[in-house]
Amino acid sequence: MAAAVAMRGSSSDGGGYDKVSGMDSGKYVRYTPEQVEALERVYADCPKPTSSRRQQLLRECPILANIEPKQIKVWFQNRRCRDKQRKESSRLQAVNRKLTAMNKLLMEENERLQKQVSQLVHENAHMRQQLQNTPLANDTSCESNVTTPQNPLRDASNPSGLLSIAEETLTEFLSKATGTAIDWVQMPGMKPGPDSVGIVAISHGCRGVAARACGLVNLEPTKVVEILKDRPSWFRDCRNLEVFTMIPAGNGGTVELVYTQLYAPTTLVPARDFWTLRYTTTMEDGSLVVCERSLSGSGGGPSAASAQQYVRAEMLPSGYLVRPCEGGGSIVHIVDHLDLEAWSVPEVLRPLYESSRVVAQKMTTAALRHIRQIAQETSGEVVYALGRQPAVLRTFSQRLSRGFNDAISGFNDDGWSIMGGDGVEDVVIACNSTKKIRSNSNAGIAFGAPGGIICAKASMLLQSVPPAVLVRFLREHRSEWADYNIDAYLASTLKTSACSLTGLRPMRFSGSQIIIPLAHTVENEEILEVVRLEGQPLTHDEALLSRDIHLLQLCTGIDEKSVGSSFQLVFAPIDDFPDETPLISSGFRVIPLDMKTDGASSGRTLDLASSLEVGSATAQASGDASADDCNLRSVLTIAFQFPYELHLQDSVAAMARQYVRSIVSAVQRVSMAISPSQTGLNAGQRIISGFPEAATLARWVCQSYHYHLGVELLSQSDGDAEQLLKMLWHYQDAILCCSFKEKPVFTFANKAGLDMLETSLVALQDLTLDRIFDEPGKEALFSNIPKLMEQGHVYLPSGVCMSGMGRHVSFDQAVAWKVLAEDSNVHCLAFCFVNWSFV
């Protein structure tokens, strides 16, 4: 109340007058400038001083001797309120500016759509009139609809000719960015709003594939243009961008001849390149424009020898329109319009080159997200772990991704060459003798003997396997496919100057992996993390040696709401974190071939119960498993890199080939386990072998809870078994069931339980009860076991447990009870963790 009174009576200049509560309504305290300065110094160090601190202030500052302690208290209250008001006012002004800009953007989009509707109505009326008046003149009625061919390539050595092409490119680009040159439709799954990446649209019925995005970013136009022109920094598929010629143009603009190389997304298709003209200029209203188009469909650019591994693609007028925004920031329009020569790839992979949605996700929205990411980092909104600078972590992500792309594409000019196989063409082995791994201690030393890198890679088609589900499983359950000794071999190459196979000691993976988050993008489409794999020595002598392995890992598309065009898990062993750490990238990439309109498959979770809506009604589950999920096709690419010494080249190649084959087999097993068509048919039996069906278990859990505790677990416990199962599955607290054995293993969990453990029903059996509790939790549990056996239930105090990924989870209370079967024998133990959350 005193603060409120003080606020009403305070001056707005920060400290002239203060009205003291409890005093006369007309009595104010006037502070001298010296007194205000002294109080401001204290406020800067401690905005909310205690009573003793205020008393100390009066003693130490004679200038404040004539002010009562109560008046000092009110001054600090008043000062805090003014500070809070200023911050809130600043925040609201920023929000208002953003909403004003978004409103302007939406009004412009609405105006463009109205023009498009008018144009379509006019064309429709014209077409109807033609059909009515000239029914027999079909051969001539279409002449007006023939698309005007692209202008032929003019003399590239003639600057005036290039400037003319640049102006034409600018006009065509603007007609796409803000006009109706292309019939744009909103991309499915993208909902515009203040928190969205922007307004995203894809082409309908035009030549090639095209995408358009517009959004608001908190960066100045010149900075936005600088970032967007540096395409390799944000477009992960861009291998190289080289400017061959630069010609000055009017308004301080430039015309450039640019050669761009793209990576191949998989080993099954060739890479693409572009030979383009890029025009940068300033508009009359102060907007900046960067527009670009191919100079020709083929020919031009570097020599044929350097481009022999590429298919020349065509860029139709595309680019960026960046307009300054009142109050700071920019409104950005991005258009990508390409002809990717889909004829040159196998038919099954052509959707990758014929889908405008793929272009929107890989290029257009990627550019907008990258700008937003940098804007948030610049403003200090993003704070990363371990004190790392955002730019440094972003560099690590780029290096991981680039190394993986290099391995998949295997360009000759990078030193890659194909090695002979063993007669079976399932795994491709490539060798690069020019690529060296340098030690940290001496950057001039690579290996003790000449060597290089061997890459084993394979691609396979997957049917009915949701990509995000597969990548999440590979990330969370490395022991299902990885060989710890191979990881140890790769890690050892960073610590020693020799890559020896015989020097490795056999080790066993303990099954424990700790994931430490480092950074993530704005919408969590990319996550950078460190993974620690705990090794288990086979002999007592080795127990004293540290055998843990650390991996730097980049995950793409594993978020529940991901609707991306590529899902990746890329990693490399690391020994330290200096900027020059060598990264030998390996991993997996899954690319959907059937781009669905609703993006539902990637939001599916790993648990089998979700495909049932949970329960034993397998017939319903089989029917409910989306037909899109069951027919979903994708291509999986696997690439693993191995350093070698020259005299061990053949041995490392054989090891690499066999290792990748074993990974392919493991992925095939996992794919069958998580396929919706399989889970729908067998989910009732798959909850665990020899276990009762889920509906029966749910009934036993609820009945036993009521029997032991005297209260109902669920609000409606008198429904049928399947209804109970659905309610138990969606219950707010985590419910876990474990076997009633000497070493209890988890056998079932509801959705909250799986979220808490960060696992799935497929991998739940890998977790034991003792693994999730810390030491105090284990002591509390073990000390209460006699009580649990005697009375059938026990309450555990609040504490901390561990998820399957090694994260700490706090809970307010836990309840454990015995689950009785029909014959009244103990079938399993059940736990309920109340109000759990990640620490």
UniProtKB/Swiss-Prot annotation:
Signal peptide: none annotated. Residues 1-24, 132-157 are annotated as: Disordered. One of its GO terms (molecular function) is DNA binding. One of its GO terms (cellular component) is nucleus. Residues 155-383 form the START domain. The keyword Ubl conjugation does not apply. CDD domains: bZIP, homeodomain, START_ArGLABRA2_like. It is found in: Nucleus. Keywords: Coiled coil, DNA-binding, Homeobox, Nucleus, Transcription, Transcription regulation. Residues 91-134 form a coiled coil. Expressed in stems, leaf sheaths and blades and panicles. Induction: Repressed by miR166 in the shoot apicam meristem (SAM) region of developing embryo. Pfam families: Homeodomain, MEKHLA, START. InterPro entries: HD (IPR001356), HD-Zip_III (IPR044830), Homeodomain-like_sf (IPR009057), MEKHLA (IPR013978), START-like_dom_sf (IPR023393), START_lipid-bd_dom (IPR002913). The keyword RNA-binding does not apply. Gene3D superfamilies: 3.30.530.20, Homeodomain-like. Its main location: nucleus. Belongs to the HD-ZIP homeobox family. Class III subfamily. Probable transcription factor. This is Homeobox-leucine zipper protein HOX10. The gene is HOX10.
